[in-house]
Design a protein with these regions (language model features):
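C-terminal alpha-helical cap/extension of soluble enzyme domains
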Residues: 115-180
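Glycine-enriched alpha-helix->loop->beta-strand junction motifs that scaffold or abut catalytic
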Residues: 14, 34-41, 57-67, 90-95, ...
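Active-site-adjacent beta->alpha loops and helix N-cap segments on the catalytic face
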Residues: 1-11, 26, 46-62, 76-79, ...
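Short, acidic/polar
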Residues: 26-34, 77-87
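Outer-membrane beta-barrel transmembrane domain signature
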Residues: 81-89, 96, 103
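Generic hydrophobic/aromatic pocket-lining and core-packing "Φ" positions
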Residues: 5, 30-32, 54-55, 85, ...
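N-terminal active-site wall of soluble small-molecule enzyme domains
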Residues: 1-38
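Catalytic beta/alpha-barrel core
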Residues: 18-24, 39-51, 66-75, 94-105
C-alpha cells in the first residue's frame, strides 16, 4: 500500500495527495495511519472516535489533517454550519471541511456564506465548503471566492453527489476564474 502511494506521489508531483476512506472506522484509521508521512493530507471524519490520536500521530509524521463533516441528506441552516466549523476547529485539525446536500440551488449559498462568515470572523484554519448534489455544483466552482481552499473532482466515477470529473472541473474553473 505504501509503495503504491509513493508511486502516486511521483506521478502527481504538482498535486497534493489527500487520502480519504469511506467505510468502517477501524479499517479507515488503519489505512490513514499507513498513509501518514507519504500523503500530504489525511481526511478524518469529525465524529471519528480516535480523532485526537490521529491528529497527534499525523503531526509527528508531518502530515496535515483535514477534519470533515458530511450531511448527505440535508443542508443545515447557516448558524448550524458555523457552529460545526467552530466545533471542528477545536479538534486541532489543520483544515476544516463541511459538505452538505443541496436540494435547491439557493442552498449552495447557505454553506458558502457560512464559510465566508467563519473565515472573516475567526480565520484560524483553512476551510473547505461544498454543497453536494446537482443543485450544489456551482459551489464546487465558486467556493474559492468564499474562502474555501480545496475543491474535489473524480477521474470518471463520482465519489459524491454532484461531483464533476477532473477534466470538466478544470475547464469550469478556468472559465470562472478566467485563467485561460
Amino acid at each position: 500500500f505504501k509503495a503504491i502511494l509513493r508511486d502516486i506521489k511521483k506521478l502527481c508531483r504538482e498535486k497534493k495527495l489527500i487520502v480519504d476512506y469511506k467505510g468502517d472506522e477501524e479499517t479507515g484509521n488503519l489505512i490513514q495511519r499507513w498513509s501518514m508521512g507519504i500523503a500530504d493530507i489525511i481526511d478524518v471524519d469529525a465524529d471519528n472516535t480516535q480523532i485526537r490520536e490521529m491528529i497527534r500521530e499525523a503531526r509527528r509524521k508531518k502530515t496535515k489533517i483535514l477534519v470533515s463533516h458530511h450531511l448527505f441528506d440535508r443542508m443545515p441552516e447557516r448558524d448550524e454550519i458555523s457552529t460545526q466549523f467552530v466545533k471542528m476547529e477545536r479538534t486541532g485539525g489543520d483544515i476544516l471541511k463541511i459538505a452538505c446536500f443541496a436540494e435547491k440551488e439557493s442552498q449552495s449559498y447557505e454553506i458558502l456564506e457560512a464559510a465566508c462568515a467563519y473565515t472573516q470572523l475567526r480565520n484560524h484554519k483553512p476551510i473547505v465548503a461544498i454543497a453536494m448534489g446537482e443543485e450544489g455544483q456551482a459551489s464546487r466552482i465558486c467556493a474559492g471566492d468564499f474562502g474555501s481552499v480545496i475543491t474535489y473532482s473524480c477521474g470518471t466515477v463520482p465519489t459524491a453527489p454532484g461531483q464533476f470529473n477532473a477534466k470538466d472541473l478544470s475547464k469550469y474553473l478556468d472559465i470562472y476564474y478566467e485563467r485561460r
